Amino acid sequence: MKKYDLIYCDPPWQYSNKVSNGAANNHYQTTSLFDLKHLPVHTIAAENSVLAMWYTGNFVQEAFELAKAWGFTVRTSKAFTWIKFNSLAHERFDKALQNGTLFDFHDMLDLLNAETKMNGGNYTRANSEDVLIATRGNGLERMSASVKQVVFRCLGEHSQKPWEVKNRLEQLYGDVNRIELFARDMSQGWDAWGNECPNNSIEFTGPQFITKAVTID
């Protein structure tokens, strides 16, 4: 079986809140933490490898538990932080520039704050999402020291993550064997696996996971 140096994933977390979980299930199939833990990721991970995993503030503990269950040790909980802008924020920025309503730096900051996505939250309203990095063995050598943490991107389709993060991971770790789990489509240079992915590159067997893994060159 092919082994991967870099494993990137956005797990389909199952919310305990019925409203939140129902909203997620309207767009994709969610999976319990128990079943996620039993996905045999350790069988495809190289002896020295890196896991980059998306999670929200509701799933901090679960993300750490899942990384451990897959054989990884979390090294940083905030390798990347995506600041979410409303899907049409770019149009309103362009309009403000054309109309001359941005007079100074403070105007720009006000508009940036106004255009960040306002999600739910029991304390503050969430408008960011994080990627942790965990390692197995010695992990991977860092190929670039100029990769930044914060990603500013507009929202796409429901739960769709910005392509910029995969690009930065490529810069960070170079040309290694890499795969995206729970993928919805294929990316050049990446293998992929997921029940919505048109061409899977590997086979996983488990309680809910039987499918097959493909690389786009």
Segments from the language model and where they lie:
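Class I S-adenosyl-L-methionine-dependent methyltransferase catalytic core
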Residues: M1-D217
